[in-house]
Curated annotation (Swiss-Prot):
NCBIfam families: rplD_bact. SUPFAM superfamilies: Ribosomal protein L4. InterPro entries: Ribosomal_uL4 (IPR002136), Ribosomal_uL4-like (IPR013005), Ribosomal_uL4_dom_sf (IPR023574). Part of the 50S ribosomal subunit. One of the primary rRNA binding proteins, this protein initially binds near the 5'-end of the 23S rRNA. It is important during the early stages of 50S assembly. It makes multiple contacts with different domains of the 23S rRNA in the assembled 50S subunit and ribosome. Forms part of the polypeptide exit tunnel. It holds the Pfam family Ribosomal_L4. It comes from Paracoccus denitrificans (strain Pd 1222). The gene is rplD. Keywords: Ribonucleoprotein, Ribosomal protein, RNA-binding, rRNA-binding. Signal peptide: none annotated. Belongs to the universal ribosomal protein uL4 family. The lineage of its organism: Bacteria, Pseudomonadati, Pseudomonadota, Alphaproteobacteria, Rhodobacterales. The keyword rRNA-binding applies. One of its GO terms (biological process) is translation. This is Large ribosomal subunit protein uL4. It comes from the Bacteria.
């Protein structure tokens, strides 16, 4: 598929041929869902924790005699049945991550790129070269192009001036091509790729 290439100041800079195997697929919601779930589960801290029966600080003395009180048989004040007792089978620190085959991850990225292309939310710019690392320059480019919440993906390395200038802008994320991932692509309204970014992604996903 062919796509127009623009400059940062919204001028024309020719066109580019995008691989149909990467940008022209019919997006599959099930694949995207699987990959996003995998990403979010891997990022989850898993630090949730409660005190169990063995963790609660109480005397281990039997609270009252076994027989003759008319009450139920109890040995420990730590039991979950008592107020301030331990929690039965409560959450403990653990990893929520699970495995997902590399082929599924790569296919998910292709479908995320295809989804943006199909929705008309994919933009290709010539380069991210700016003279100085000035936030105003990037803010002007974002405004002129009508971008609201945007993810910008460059080649192997992001233009340093652009990355520094974009740091203070809310709703503008900048990644190198190796950092491209399904979750970040889908959570932003517009995906902006540089020519170098397109080449790097196509080489990565061949």
């Amino acid at each position: 598929m062919k796509l127009d290439v623009i400059t940062l100041d919204a001028g024309k800079a020719g066109d580019i041929d995008l691989s149909d195997d990467i940008f022209g697929l019919e997006p599959r919601a099930d694949l995207l869902h699987r990959v996003v779930r995998w990403q979010r589960a891997k990022a989850q801290a898993g630090t949730h924790s409660v005190l169990g029966k063995s963790d609660v600080s109480y005397s281990t003395k039997k609270i009252y005699r076994q027989k003759g009180t008319g009450g139920a048989r109890h040995g420990s004040r730590k039991a979950p049945i008592f107020r301030h007792g331990g929690v039965y089978k409560g959450p403990t620190p653990r990893s929520h991550a699970f495995d997902l085959p590399k082929k599924v991850r790569a296919l998910g990225l292709k479908h995320a790129l295809s989804a943006k292309a199909a929705a008309g939310e994919l933009v290709v710019v010539d380069s991210l070269n700016i003279a100085e690392a000035k936030t105003a320059a990037v803010a002007k480019a974002v405004k002129e192009n009508g971008w609201k919440r945007v993810l910008v993906i460059d080649g192997a390395e992001v233009n340093e001036n652009f990355a520094r200038a974009a740091r203070n802008l809310e709703g503008v994320d900048v990644l190198p091509s190796m950092g491209a991932n399904v979750y970040d692509i889908l959570r932003r309204d517009t995906l902006v790729l540089t020519r170098a970014g397109v080449e790097a992604l196509e080489a990565r996903l061949k």
